[in-house]
């Protein structure tokens, strides 16, 4: 099993982890109902995806 030769300092550890933060997901605008939704998914308010009705949504 591999064992590190020397101890890594807290600064070195934190520099390595500086890229581990979660990215905020962007929002797209639905072309049918103009509501915000997550890209590459069906719009939750109207049920359209790429201009086509995919699911029926009760209002």
From Swiss-Prot:
The gene is rpmF. This is Large ribosomal subunit protein bL32. It comes from Chlamydia trachomatis serovar D (strain ATCC VR-885 / DSM 19411 / UW-3/Cx). GO terms for cellular component: cytosolic large ribosomal subunit. Belongs to the bacterial ribosomal protein bL32 family. One of its GO terms (molecular function) is structural constituent of ribosome. It holds the Pfam family Ribosomal_L32p. One of its GO terms (biological process) is translation. Keywords: Ribonucleoprotein, Ribosomal protein. Residues 1-20 are annotated as: Disordered.
